[in-house]
Amino acid sequence: MNSKIQKMELNDGHSIPVLGFGTYATEENLRKKSMESTKIAIDVGFRHIDCSHLYQNEEEIGQAIVSKIEDGTVKREDIFYTSKLWSTSHRPELVRPSLENSLRKLNLDYVDLYLIHFPVSLKPGDELLPQDEHGNLILDTVDLCDTWEAMEKCKDAGLAKSIGVSNFNRRQLEKILNKPGLKHRPVCNQVECHLYLNQSKLLAYCKMNDIVLVAYGALGTQRYKYCINEDTPVLLDDPILCTMAKKYKRTPALIALRYQLERGIVTLVKSFNEERIRENLQVFDFQLASDDMEILDNLDRNLRYFPANMFKAHPNFPFSDEY
């Protein structure tokens, strides 16, 4: 099946499909599900798959991709696969081994995009969130410019076609962009972005610097108890959004996704439900009028569903700045 998903050019000459399939699964029993849903996503036309070492399901996602290559649904070059460097591997000597470890699990020769997942560095080791005896995270101090140099080497070695960052604020992006001897610019910054956190200032800054903004959490959140405040409003229940959905005869989710695409944002969407996975591709079947875009712009309330407060003590915590 030919994918109707449009692509956006990156600053290094590669291009990224503007709609991506997210694979984050919180619990072990969902990892199997993430494999099945990734197969479905590829079958219905998704070509951009977003994963990470942190999600602990790269093996399953790799199996899904390889099985779809083996059955002739896609070729490797049809798939745009993103992986991410976790915070316990920021030290330069750990960057390439971490990527190679992901590639082994995936059974792939390269990733299309490799991101620094979060700007906060943690103590190296097997524990994803290393803690001391009091339950506090054990932080590490690494210059992100040194990490970036190691990322550049991964690109030069052909292990990653493109490299970028995630959850960086403007100041942190500037630090990389102004690094002496910078060889490769970040192609993107993947951040939480939705109607209640529309990231308009960060988006403007990224566009000015030819960096693509990639949105996660574009539909709000699946309300994981461990990481969000349950008192936060449910984005897809927003009355203005629901009224607009009726006007366009679409679901609130499709309006929320279309809003991002109209702004030139690459958007990730995650579902384990086959019907919804198919439905999400309908985002290319309509457009929003400019006055409706303005109405949606005004829903912004600077609300983070993923505040990542456990990292607040680190000097590189990204969300204390305005953007």
Swiss-Prot record:
Location (main, coarse): cytoplasm
Highest taxon, organism lineage: Eukaryota
Site feature: Important for substrate specificity: L54
Residues that hold substrate according to the record: H117
Paired cysteines (S-S): none
PANTHER family: ALDO/KETO REDUCTASE
Entry protein name: Aldo-keto reductase family 1 member C18
Annotated organism of origin: Rattus norvegicus
